[in-house]
Amino acid sequence: MSGNILVLGGSQFVGPAFIRLLQSKKYSVSVLNRGSKPVEGTTQLIADRNDKAAMQQHAGTHYDAVIDLSCYNAPQAQIAWETFSEDADRWVYLSTIAVYEDTPLPTEEAGIESAAYWGGYGKGKAAADAYVLGQSGPPLVILRPPYLYGPENHIDRERFVWRHALAGKPIAIPGDGTALVQFLHIEDLATALFLAMTTENLTYNVFNVAGKEQMT
């Protein structure tokens, strides 16, 4: 199977891992971002996604799927949707578990108000989720991963722990040390994005994607 895919974002961490998977399966990939870090083997579209006029200069091309990896708030979601949804056969939006309100035990009914400790990031992503879920158009799939790790991570997360461990420095534990978190390897997220893009007749359109293991 092959097709024409548009990736919004795509220049850091998640994008390159997902694009490599698409290229291995012979998809034609266009990448839309500010163009500061071109992705080899793709068609580069340059626009600031906050600029509706700049985005709409790239409208009108049919895509088998639009994969939105770089949306952080409702205005960005709206500009992208209004620009590309009419020409897309499917829309995959990368969200985050940070959209969930603080609950003792997660449930299918958990709201997307975002816990206070996520600050503006969680609130912005929750608003973007609410926007795309309220639209009619191509089939929509939303993935909500937890903390990501793996090669080319630009966030100083696992490297911080390894540096301290190798140097024999103490590693601070947030809070009282009882909080449980889950992680997801970047290649597993790339696979999940691909399945969200290609799987037909899904029963649900919002999925939490995480590793099985919980840790403090």
Segments (PLM) and residue ranges:
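SDR active-site strand-loop-helix element
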Residues: 8, 32, 69, 94-96, ...
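Short amphipathic alpha-helix with an adjacent loop that forms part of the alpha/beta core around
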Residues: 52-61
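Alpha-helical substrate-binding/gating segment
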Residues: 162-172, 179-214
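N-terminal Rossmann NAD(P)H-binding glycine-rich loop of SDR-like oxidoreductase domains
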Residues: 5-25
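Rossmann-fold cofactor-recognition segment
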Residues: 41-51, 70-72
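N-terminal Rossmann-fold cofactor-binding loop
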Residues: 32-36, 48-49
